From Swiss-Prot:
Xref: SUPFAM superfamilies: S-adenosyl-L-methionine-dependent methyltransferases
Gene: rsmA
Binding sites annotated in the UniProt record for S-adenosyl-L-methionine: 13, 15, 40, 61, 86, 105
Upper lineage: Bacteria, Pseudomonadati, Pseudomonadota, Gammaproteobacteria, Cardiobacteriales
Protein's recorded name: Ribosomal RNA small subunit methyltransferase A
Function summary: Specifically dimethylates two adjacent adenosines (A1518 and A1519) in the loop of a conserved hairpin near the 3'-end of 16S rRNA in the 30S particle. May play a critical role in biogenesis of 30S subunits.
Transmembrane annotation, as ranges: none
Compartment(s) where it occurs, according to its Swiss-Prot or TrEMBL record: Cytoplasm
Amino acid sequence: MTEIKAVKRLGQHFLRDEGIITQLLAAIDPKPQQKILEIGPGLGALTLPVLERCHELYAVELDHRVLQPLSEKAAAVGILHLIERDILNIHFAEVAPAPIRIIGNLPYNLSSPILFHCVAQRSDIVDMHFMLQKEVVDRITAPVDTPAYGRLSVMIQLYCQVEALFDVPPEAFAPPPKVNSAVVRLIPQTQLTWNIESIAHFECVVRSAFSQRRKMLRKSLAAYFEPKELMALDVDPTARAETIDGASFARLANALYLKEKNL
């Protein structure tokens, strides 16, 4: 394949370490007949070995430069459906038959928007395996009352079972990023982790609490609750967001929903 240099504005870091590719392939464990969609195949380091095992693969790529070389390389391996579009503008069911598995070495500058785009379509998804900045994987998988725990932890864990699989050093990529990477597995759940009346109210409470994470809840949630209301919901008004688990956020969100509904 003709040498193609990574484009910084696209957040490209091409995977090149064969050992890491083998580990990632083992984690994904692609099988024939499975419908798999890859986000950002790039130069095909993961694309081609996955295609070799599942025989047919869907891949969404925004970088026009890689399409023809990748298509030519894949022709001898299996059927590769290349879609030249922005992943954030795609409804997965439009380009690949559901249920689908999603894989990808995600651009670090777009990882959170892509994650939320995926969980919004979770009913069509079997599982997801993503290479991300290690800090993001730590945040996704963080338990309550740990430094990495935050809005991303709560929101992704609401929708998915999460598991950090292994770390990836910078030298596994070309060019090497300035940070460590990691691979995470996300499995959408058929039911939400916590009982929630309104996703919008849950998102609102979680966002407000973590937007001022060093403030006590009586301050960060003052627009919605009096301290006595927090105590009635078994939430300490002097606590900070990082010490509040998902179930407690669900209670707060449900109370806010009922409060506004009865106005």
